[in-house]
C-alpha cells in the first residue's frame, strides 16, 4: 500500500501579525478610526466600548505589537494582540467576533 502525502497549507500568524503592523493604517482606516501616531505608539478613542470620548483611550504599541484600552480595560475581555483588537472592533459592530472571523477580516485587507 502506497502512502500518500497530504499537502497542508499553514498560516504563519507571526508573519500575518508582522504584515499588519508594517502597514497598520490599512486596518485602522478600514474600521474608519481616527488616530494619532506618536513615535511607535498609536492613540485613539476606544472603538470597542460605547461613549468613548478620551482621544488617548486606546494605545497600540508598534514595538510590542499589543494594544490596551486605558479607559475601561477592554483588552482584559478580548486580549492584547492585534487579532483580539480586531475581534473587539467586530464585536462592537455586532459582527461575528471569533478568532477565525478576525483572521478572515485581516486576510481580506492584506
Regions found by a protein language model. Name each.
Residues 1-110:
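N-terminal structured subdomain of primase-like DNA metabolism proteins
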Amino acid at each position: 500500500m502506497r502512502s500518500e502525502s497530504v499537502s497542508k497549507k499553514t498560516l504563519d500568524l507571526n508573519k500575518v501579525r508582522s504584515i499588519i503592523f508594517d502597514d497598520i493604517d490599512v486596518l485602522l482606516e478600514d474600521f474608519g478610526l481616527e488616530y494619532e501616531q506618536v513615535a511607535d505608539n498609536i492613540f485613539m478613542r476606544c472603538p470597542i466600548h460605547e461613549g468613548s470620548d478620551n482621544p488617548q483611550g486606546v494605545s497600540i504599541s508598534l514595538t510590542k505589537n499589543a494594544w490596551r484600552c486605558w479607559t475601561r480595560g477592554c483588552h482584559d475581555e478580548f486580549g492584547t494582540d492585534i487579532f483580539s483588537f480586531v475581534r473587539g472592533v467586530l464585536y462592537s459592530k455586532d459582527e461575528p467576533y471569533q478568532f477565525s472571523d478576525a483572521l478572515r477580516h485581516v486576510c481580506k485587507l492584506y
